[in-house]
Amino acid sequence: MSNVKQVLTIAGSDSGGGAGIQADLKTFQMRGVFGTSAITAVTAQNTLGVFDIHPIPLKTIQAQLEAVKNDFQIASCKIGMLGNAEIIECVADFLADKPFGTLVLDPVMIAKGGAPLLQRQAVSALSQKLLPLADVITPNIPEAEALTGIAIVDDISIQQAAKALQKQGAKNVIIKGGHSLNSQSELCQDWVLLADGRHFTLQSPRFNTPHTHGTGCTFSACLTAELAKGEPLQSAVKTAKDFITAAISHPLNIGQGHGPTNHWAYSRL
């Protein structure tokens, strides 16, 4: 398998295994790419919540990135939890010359249980430093609102937010609809704005389950894997949508709270 594609995740570690680095590597494995990692923070968490966050020293983050760069041919890279402005600036400076191919930015801000994973003052650093480097950004609705200052209440405002993210530098925008504009809707709709101005939506059934921990990480990791394999963005987004839909709709029922998704589900359909 000398032609296996190599990818990188830059994110936090989740001791509960449902999100972050752990979810990314599981997804990479299931999608047939070789995953490498640079850990930005170690979190103590499980399905019930986040109990401690320990940011990794900047020199250690940079050393991880250097180690990956010097030995692997990374076709695409995803960024997840960064935690604070200093880490954002460290990562952005390293990625300035795009050493890791296509860059997918998942602007992780809040854990599924509500715990903040990005300091409030770091949002502007994310907008100014990383958005201009992103080939694709994958915020959910609350994250898109935080990055743009636009209250997303309908289809018009979600389009405005997507265009605002493009103006900040992101080339392609995917606003995920898990946090529905209509809480009674039976559908989950993602809104996609491509670099050339075309846009489309992707729909899936909405499932009444608490086991959605790590959905954003898993979606963006699958997208990263498909882009590494050379899939066009529209096709890659569709695969990522199908992958996470399968993962949510076949829950593992692990833990006492917001449990993880099922990374095996898509391959077993």
UniProtKB/Swiss-Prot annotation:
Q: What is the role of the protein in this entry?
A: Catalyzes the phosphorylation of hydroxymethylpyrimidine phosphate (HMP-P) to HMP-PP, and of HMP to HMP-P.
Leader sequence segment: none
Q: Which CDD domains match?
A: HMPP_kinase
Any one Gene Ontology MF annotation carried by this entry is: hydroxymethylpyrimidine kinase activity
List, in alphabetical order, the GO biological process terms annotated in this UniProt record. thiamine biosynthetic process; thiamine diphosphate biosynthetic process
Q: Which UniProt keywords apply?
A: ATP-binding, Kinase, Nucleotide-binding, Thiamine biosynthesis, Transferase
Task: Kindly give the InterPro entries that the UniProt entry links to this protein.
Answer: HMP/HMP-P_kinase_dom, PM/HMP-P_kinase-1, Ribokinase-like
Encoding gene per record = thiD
As its record notes, the protein acts as a catalyst of:
4-amino-5-hydroxymethyl-2-methylpyrimidine + ATP = 4-amino-2-methyl-5-(phosphooxymethyl)pyrimidine + ADP + H(+); 4-amino-2-methyl-5-(phosphooxymethyl)pyrimidine + ATP = 4-amino-2-methyl-5-(diphosphooxymethyl)pyrimidine + ADP
The protein depicted here goes by the name Hydroxymethylpyrimidine/phosphomethylpyrimidine kinase
Q: Which family does it belong to?
A: Belongs to the ThiD family.
Identify the residues that bind 4-amino-5-hydroxymethyl-2-methylpyrimidine. Answer: Q45
EC number(s) recorded for this UniProt protein: 2.7.1.49, 2.7.4.7
Keyword set includes Cell cycle:
no
* Gene Ontology cellular component annotations, sorted alphabetically: cytosol
